[in-house]
Amino acid sequence: MAPKKAKRRAGAEGSSNVFSMFDQTQIQEFKEAFTVIDQNRDGIIDKEDLRDTFAAMGRLNVKNEELDAMMKEASGPINFTVFLTMFGEKLKGADPEDVITGAFKVLDPEGKGTIKKQFLEELLTTQCDRFSQEEIKNMWAAFPPDVGGNVDYKNICYVITHGDAKDQE
């Protein structure tokens, strides 16, 4: 009986290890991100969930090879624990500015360094910790979009991690 207990405990530590890497707020934010990606709400992120997520971001022609490569990053089905583990491994030792910039880059498949104001505003007001209209107004005052309606997310990332706007050269 003792060996079973020890075995169970070791297994539990293995799965709880990933949860000890993040605080409760971070885990909740990852859970919200997981829920956004898990489009069919079955508790598993699959290829169709990824395709639907890209479509929701305006990227309609994602190649199967690209989706397959993403799915192969996991050793099996991507439930929340696997999702959290994958991010834990990627974020280990990462610079916070790089992490935040990387999150924005997902929304910028063309690598322009900008995203559409309308799209960002929709995300911020409809997903996860929703921004109020006052918060949106303050954001656009701090980070005004250009004449084409594009927002420079690299500057946003810099301010989030350093507190001051980067000098424009």
UniProtKB/Swiss-Prot annotation:
Myosin regulatory subunit that plays an essential role to maintain muscle integrity during early development. Plays a role in regulation of muscle contraction. This chain binds calcium. The keyword rRNA processing does not apply. Ca(2+) binds at D38, N40, D42, D49. Myosin is a hexamer of 2 heavy chains and 4 light chains. The modification Phosphothreonine is found at T25, T35, T101. Residues 25-60, 95-130, 131-166 form the EF-hand domain. SMART domains: EFh (SM00054). InterPro entries: EF-hand-dom_pair, EF_Hand_1_Ca_BS, EF_hand_dom, Myosin_RLC. The keyword Endoplasmic reticulum does not apply. This is Myosin regulatory light chain 11. Keywords: Calcium, Metal-binding, Methylation, Motor protein, Muscle protein, Myosin, Phosphoprotein, Repeat. PANTHER family: MYOSIN REGULATORY LIGHT CHAIN 2. GO terms for molecular function: calcium ion binding; structural constituent of muscle. The modification Phosphoserine is found at S15, S16, S75. GO terms for cellular component: myosin complex. It comes from Mus musculus (Mouse). Disruption phenotype: Deficient mice completely lack skeletal muscle and die immediately after birth because of respiratory failure. GO terms for biological process: muscle contraction; skeletal muscle tissue development. The modification N,N,N-trimethylalanine is found at A2.
